[in-house]
Amino acid sequence: MTRVVLAAAYRTPIGVFGGAFKDVPAYDLGATLIEHIIKETGLNPSEIDEVIIGNVLQAGQGQNPARIAAMKGGLPETVPAFTVNKVCGSGLKSIQLAYQSIVTGENDIVLAGGMENMSQSPMLVNNSRFGFKMGHQSMVDSMVYDGLTDVFNQYHMGITAENLVEQYGISREEQDTFAVNSQHKAVRAQQNGEFDSEIVPVSIPQRKGEPILVTKDEGVRENVSVEKLSRLRPAFKKDGTVTAGNASGINDGAAMMLVMSEDKAKELNIEPLAVLDGFGSHGVDPSIMGIAPVGAVEKALKRSKKELSDIDVFELNEAFAAQLLAVDRELKLPPEKVNVKGGAIALGHPIGASGARVLVTLLHQLNDEVETGLTSLCIGGGQAIAAVVSKYK
């Protein structure tokens, strides 16, 4: 079977809600990365067979945001593109689709990833197409409803985390401790420049003066403690334990990678970073969607012909501290190998981009001693996706 390799992998900094990227469309964030990858690899843009990009909150951006990003990123009009929506798994699903297209021989070179600007998601006025006869009308927050609400139960993703808290007996202190550790690891990594190789700075033009250059993730917080987090009120139910402090944020960002057949990489003298070994997807009861990575991880390992003990580093999306703690109850992961640079609680969770973001961060950790990695994300609606990669040899 054709070996599929990852030849370049980058991400933007992750902006906080209403932060540096509030006026930057998702497709511009994606275009920045496409342009950078072309420049870094020296690849002829016309040699790219397809562009596949995850994006959840598409309303108001225009037709097919992936196509917009591709064209604005400097690709010729002959290169096709399409947009993927698998909620939080969109970015990783896009990479899986690229992988599948190469294995089947349909493509040789694909740009794949994810992008999201949650700050720009519009408010919707449903049923207003033909006007209102009388009475009060309300707006729907597309970010909350299309991105963060379980449509089957009509409640916020945070309630699915609370459901896992009850099922697995997870304490508030456990969650807050997990969140603090995520922040501390991210602070250390940021201060030591450990994200520098994966981040492409984004220049934001200003009406007056020089452009602003965004170089670092905005959500990383110093001086966070369990004591401080313990003062926060529950965010989703009166007697709950999930708070804004032990959950991922609402964020803006993008991540992208160059997916190729090994033969094409050799032909073009492009040195790959890693080999894609296999993927797994799984579904569960939507009310406990956060536990779905257990099944996805098991399937990805089986398809990659690996055991959990073979994995040197894990990058697992931290939708909620409770969610990842529940997954750990089942998989019993070695803590020293999990999210060693911090996770989404600290870095942020731009939903359509996160699937690619966790893989980008993982790839930049591979070396002669850290050769095999696994990444996974839970997905609203009761799903999950996982992938296993190995350092290219």
UniProtKB/Swiss-Prot annotation:
A single GO cellular-component term on record: cytoplasm
GO molecular function, a single term: acetyl-CoA C-acetyltransferase activity
EC number, as in UniProt: 2.3.1.9
SUPFAM superfamilies registered for this protein in UniProt: Thiolase-like
Annotated catalysed reactions: 2 acetyl-CoA = acetoacetyl-CoA + CoA
Alphabetically ordered keywords of this record: Acyltransferase, Cytoplasm, Transferase
Superkingdom to which the source organism belongs: Bacteria
InterPro entries with a match to the protein in the record: Thiolase, Thiolase-like, Thiolase_acyl_enz_int_AS, Thiolase_AS, Thiolase_C, Thiolase_CS, Thiolase_N
A UniProt-annotated Pfam family: Thiolase_C
Active-site annotation: 88 (acyl-thioester intermediate), 349 (proton acceptor), 378 (proton acceptor)
Subcellular location field: Cytoplasm
Subcellular location, principal: cytoplasm
Enzyme class, first EC level, given as a word: transferase
Keyword Acyltransferase: yes
Coiled coil: none
Similarity comment: family membership: Belongs to the thiolase-like superfamily. Thiolase family.
NCBIfam families per record: AcCoA-C-Actrans
Protein name per UniProt: Probable acetyl-CoA acyltransferase
